[in-house]
């Protein structure tokens, strides 16, 4: 009898342990903290909450968070740093569906780009790693990250339904030697929203090379090349459509707002609105549309292979430096049309003598 009772008790305890094991395993996977890049790479895809605690990413390696579990939350905690090596990067790569990316209070991502900066950016000198690959990061959110001193380009975005809010990219230390430190480069993407970005850099605050339904709003851009569409043309995807860039400030930058298309290329830029943009301390062009871009430089001869149609410039105000040009429109024959132009009031600087094929209603 005692033997039977003991056997029953043992069996019951064993059954309880077997039942508890999967639950414990699930608990372990629901929230994970990683302190190394290798551990995060091998384990993050199993976790619903991924905490990255003061990770020191080894030189030449990517903090690889691709293939995250659907609905996962990623939290940067402490200071994330990266070892030095000349390579193309990216320093961080992330993909998944319905992902939320944020940081704990006081956290920062410190790229220490000064180790690579040599005034040449991605045009020579040291090979520099790009910062963050957000490719196939769909139906997701990136919130409140504080990023310092990217070696070259910041976010490379090829995703659908991605919202980036209240992100700071501070490359102000790169004023003398930083170059090509674009904050947000967008290509082949749909329904991208960037809201409340604060950017100090040495290239485009945003550059939209292709994509549809893209919004940039409530931004502050300092030190770079302004708010840009393009360059468009010469890629596999050369369509920009349904873009709104609004309620933003561009200060101490080369350009204010810009559309640039590639010389002799084909493509289209349609349904684009620049609205409520305030400029100050602009050193080259307050507003520029140029269809003569070749190998990174203007030729002075625009071509008409890229349509720039249904464009709105509304309430673009502020000032440019005395040596700068207020507005420059250099369009190919017949390629710029159906523009809406109202409340464009840029002061200082000089009037352009190079405008060509200015569409009806616009003023150069």
Curated annotation (Swiss-Prot):
Keywords: Cell wall biogenesis/degradation, Disulfide bond, Glycoprotein, Glycosidase, Hydrolase, Repeat, Secreted, Signal, Zymogen. One of its GO terms (biological process) is pectin catabolic process. Its main location: secreted. GO terms for molecular function: polygalacturonase activity. Its EC number is 3.2.1.15. PbH1 repeats lie at residues 159-188, 189-210, 211-231, 240-261, 269-291, 303-348. It is an enzyme of class 3 (hydrolase). One of its GO terms (cellular component) is extracellular region. It comes from the Eukaryota. Belongs to the glycosyl hydrolase 28 family. This is Endopolygalacturonase B. It comes from Emericella nidulans (strain FGSC A4 / ATCC 38163 / CBS 112.46 / NRRL 194 / M139). The gene is pgaB.
